[in-house]
Swiss-Prot record:
Main location: membrane
Protein name, as recorded: Inner membrane-spanning protein YciB
Keyword Cell membrane: yes
Encoding gene, per UniProt annotation: yciB
InterPro entries recorded: YciB
UniProt GO cellular component terms: plasma membrane
Species of provenance: Edwardsiella ictaluri (strain 93-146)
Ranges annotated as spanning the membrane: 22-42, 50-70, 76-96, 121-141, 149-169
Similarity comment: family membership: Belongs to the YciB family.
Key words of the record: Cell inner membrane, Cell membrane, Membrane, Transmembrane, Transmembrane helix
Length: 180
């Protein structure tokens, strides 16, 4: 259910873009993200920090897109969010000395510190790479290509990277954890 609520605004954005334009889609994205946030709160009585940060960025950049009638803002949103996620991961590892990935998953999984560090760094690089890819697609290719890339390309990349991370985690789990 949680994944559906997270994915719903993206579907709304895509459908509204295909039926109308980038401005209707941006407004619908802001509204759908707000609805998803409220529904998440009502169902789980908590909202993850990543979800809240995403909502704030969607609200800011979506509103700026509508107020200034300029799609550059909604295009930059993707890169800004990915950069913030990458920075959070890197700061947690370098400054706070405990990878954010470990803080998020460490209660369920026991892995060597080196594995947590590599996984954390890999996700930081992944987010930076996605942010850079977004810049290229958003500003050098047609808007319709960017929308497809944002909805399908980045979603597929994230799913593949999540799967690869799962394989990496599994290979580094103890035999006891693998069988429990």
């Amino acid at each position: 259910m949680k994944q559906l609520l997270d994915f719903l605004p993206l579907v709304v954005f895509f459908v509204c873009y295909k039926l109308y334009d980038i401005y209707v889609a941006s407004g619908a994205l802001v509204a759908a993200t707000a609805v998803a946030l409220v529904l998440t709160w009502l169902k789980y009585r908590r909202v993850e920090k990543m979800t809240l940060i995403t909502f704030i960025m969607v609200a800011i950049f979506g509103t700026l897109t509508l107020v200034f009638h300029n799609d550059l803002f909604i295009k930059w949103k993707v890169t800004v969010i990915y950069t913030l996620f990458a920075l959070a991961l890197l700061i947690s590892q370098v400054v706070l000395k405990k990878p954010l990935i470990q803080r998020m998953l460490g209660k369920e999984l026991q892995l060597p510190d080196s594995v947590w560090s590599r996984l954390n760094a890999a996700w930081a690089l992944f987010f930076l790479g996605c942010g850079l890819a977004n810049i290229y697609v958003a500003f050098w290719l047609p808007q319709s290509v960017w929308v497809d890339f944002k909805v399908f390309g980045l979603t597929a990349l994230t799913l593949v990277f999540t799967l690869l991370s799962g394989i990496y985690i599994y290979r580094n789990m103890s035999e006891e954890q693998k069988h429990s």
